[in-house]
């Protein structure tokens, strides 16, 4: 009989109340004011006209496996009412309810029809055919108030990308007309963006009388309360953008060929190279609507650079921040960029090197912030040398509060080119993209920049003092020496009587094949949506219990994220301990069905907290805040006995149409890496649990995500798409890494030894285990061939093991059989299989399944990507 760790009472627990209150306290800081003429915060609650698709249908977070199931979601309508507002627009909101209900009914009918016609499960169609948001009713009359709030919502999710069309990236015709009507007829008009992915703001910026735009994001199950707190000034927004908001979608260099835009979802050519986000906009002098790092607040700040110091080890900037407003407190972010010299390698205009956020400062209050980052982190990747290099020349240090407000603070002079890391190229091109070049382009500049460079503090960096690290790459592992004697157990390993390698040497090939696979039997409806656990219904899967009875090795539970812990909130088991289903496992997993309790049965409850989505958390630029959110999830993992959280997601926001951008942090790899590390440190401060950073790597497209081939240069791969993962590994040592579905340069990432072993383990020192995304090593083409003209095949189980992809999820008998057969025919060395099994069991034995478990990260000497001190 299965053991369940869920509660048997449906009452709201003290933990739920505590965590909801903490999220409400933290999340307001993440919100970003794009525009404000002083209208926000409102002086108090009162009569208000509230419109928009997000008033009653507030989006707490995106869809798919990243959606956290919660007890309740506080809508913005509810939040405003609870704060004392009288909402006058019930008639309009009722009208939109009907518009939305009709659109959703038509969508569901179309899904069912298409699934029947194509003879595929409805869940396959659901994940590929996105719901098209209907336009809103037209506003025709003014209400009896001087204040109007418009809530614009957008949703997206796993399995499909967005579109550059009305009611998606673009605003609908009626949406724009309604906002313009409010701006014309009301004294105060506030637009609240309940979105996690970008929308076009060019037409909005043309509307006269639009007083404030608040990027509220998707803040979890308390979103409505948090928005009300910010609108009334009870919570102070101090977010800064972690993406560039273009004036036109076509301004993004990836726009022409991204995903479905060019009709080809099989091959994605990364012609933008290293010029992603602000690296492109600044270097090619393209003016955005809102630049990277931008964000207003309820007050103003003055930032003054006090000093810059640098040597062969570190670059250190000391700056003072003062609140020069007279009414409201606030927080400011000091952003430090560097401009590397052009040598034999092109460089962007500037790149983020470090950042630090002030404490909450009252009017007139100041604080000194010191930001330090490793000098070697300014290196670029030289494909010809297969090395990271600091090229000779002048490195300008720039300081500001956004990418378009930086000023030159120092000039670091390096006389000789230095190789910081000597490795080897790992990602040979199969069909190399024609990359952008800045040759002949005049970059962004500003009045006085040349004078700042000439007057900047000059610091010489000792070239010879920067040592070269040479990577030693691993070879195919030999078979473990056989341990002769009694059958070893987990207790023997923990006591020191024998080593884990000794125990693994005793396992049969069949046992190791089971260890290297999850316990499910393929990716059925439950597995497809991440619901393959026997011990925590709604969790994504379990590791094997085949070694429990005779060796004392427990199985562990893995659950989805990253916006909280994804479990089924309410489930029922019969007298034999078996879960009772409604007959529709898809709806059961999304908690859509009420199930009767049979005689002798038991109800269980697993209510978890939905924290802000990653894209919103990153806008805080506050690593301690993100760590606290990780701590929230960690406590709930302990309660429900979850060992591995399948999060954080940390792919790069290469293009705003990626359907899963809400799960990821930023267009910048430093921000992404530091946020993921902070989240991981929060989780892994709890004994026996850990994270799985994902999706490794270059998972920047959802359309045809399992079979798309991403063509990327070695340099762009390393500097943009791997750098964040490298930072997270070196500064937090996540317990696991999840490989992505896609191919990179013709090789499935799940089957890439160069990615999973040479880069992650040999170059970065990753110590945990790697797992596949769900269904990676199964043939899933039958589910997607109806929509995509598939060009590439799927990854294989044998090659996963060869690559160092230790755990295949959710697991199926075919995977196990392929592994056993491959060892038998000599195409899979025994030592390689033993090594994969060893890495999995090494983590399992440190999990919370054992009473002696400790915080996983405590065993590592972790680095710091950026160090911040305040005085």
Regions found by a protein language model. Name each.
Residues 386:
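Extracellular/periplasmic metallocenter environments
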